[in-house]
Amino acid sequence: VMNEIEATQMEQIKKVAEVMADCIQSGHLVHTFGCGHANLPIEEMYPRIGGIVGFHPLCELPLTFFTHIVGEMGINQFLWLEREEGYGQAIMQSWNFDKNDLLWIFSHTGVNAVNIDVANEAHKRGMKVIVCGSAGRTGDKKPRHSGGKNLFQIADYVVDTCCPLQDASVTLKNHFDKIGPLSTMASITCVWMIITTVCEILADRGMKLHINPSHNIPGDTTARERLAA
């Protein structure tokens, strides 16, 4: 999967990085959204050692915390919420955006209503939408949304994570379902390929980046000061 990303997505990664660099340099934010395990790339990028100011997580707890299969915050509630039209609109109403901000969404299949609603609301506010997901394998799937288009079809920019449709990758004897999902690894790979490119572009332009430093380096006594700055 990583080899395929490198072989097929570098041009698109550079294009997306330029768009994000322009956004951050102009003093605006790249907002990030995902639900389920697609929230993990968001947690990975910021706040994080080596991450930069400019990326703003939109983390909705009922869509990101579902370690209980049954009971409160269970998988049944999560599956209902991510497929329910209107929830994404309510999420977006809770934030203030600028038309020059960007929205970066992570979704393996791009079919669930909450992601589509969030993207549509971003467009209504004048924002461009970037999507990371398995567009090549799932890009023609019918959405769970009355609008008739999936997330990849309404995005302004798409970076393909090159994962299989089922996500899981390893077949077991006497079992129908596979194990070993790939989408989280692939999405995080795309995250850092994009963000490191963004940082290189901004550094080449002479912009001072606010980088989250490590606080665990022996002898480094200025990490807190650099963080506060």
What are these language model-derived features?
Residues H28, G36, G50-G51, G71, ...:
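Glycine-centered flexibility motif
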Residues D167-T171, C199-R226:
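Internal, active-site/partner-interface "lid" segment
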Residues N3, E18-A21, N120:
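Surface-exposed alpha-helical segments enriched in charged/polar residues
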Residues Q25, T32-I195, C199:
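Glycine-rich phosphate-binding loops that contact phosphosugars or nucleotide phosphates
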Residues Q9, E225-A228:
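NAD(P)-dependent dehydrogenase/reductase Rossmann-like domain
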Residues T8-V16, V30, L202-N212:
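Flexible, glycine/charged-enriched surface loops at secondary-structure junctions
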Residues T8-Q25, I91:
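A short, well-structured juxtamembrane/interface segment
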Residues V1-T8:
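Generic N-terminal amphipathic, Lys/Arg-enriched alpha-helix
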